[in-house]
Swiss-Prot record:
Encoding gene, per UniProt annotation: pptA
Name the record gives this protein: Tautomerase PptA
Species in which this protein is naturally found: Pectobacterium carotovorum subsp. carotovorum (strain PC1)
NCBIfam families referenced in this protein's UniProt entry, alphabetically: PRK01271.1
Alphabetic keyword roster: Cytoplasm, Isomerase
GO cellular component, one term: cytoplasm
Cross-referenced InterPro entries: 4-OT-like_dom, Tautomerase/MIF_sf, Tautomerase_PptA
Family designation: Belongs to the 4-oxalocrotonate tautomerase family. PptA subfamily.
Active site: 2
Class in the EC hierarchy, top level: isomerase
Amino acid sequence: MPHIDVKHFPRNLSEEEKKVIAEDLAAVLKKHFGSSDDSLSVAFNEIQPDRWKDEVYDPIIKPHLDTLAKKPGYSY
């Protein structure tokens, strides 16, 4: 049951753009995990740039730097 939680700076994405991105992300998981479409979910969460460190980097990224499959090229 993969769930993808995309946290990002505000982009003013339309519902259609979100749908296309979600379908693309789901296709990757279907290909590499063998997941069915019904088992996948995707969320989009806009985070203001001035809140990124407190809401994303410090609680989610920093504690898992050693195990991230793709590490960011920035730090705080």
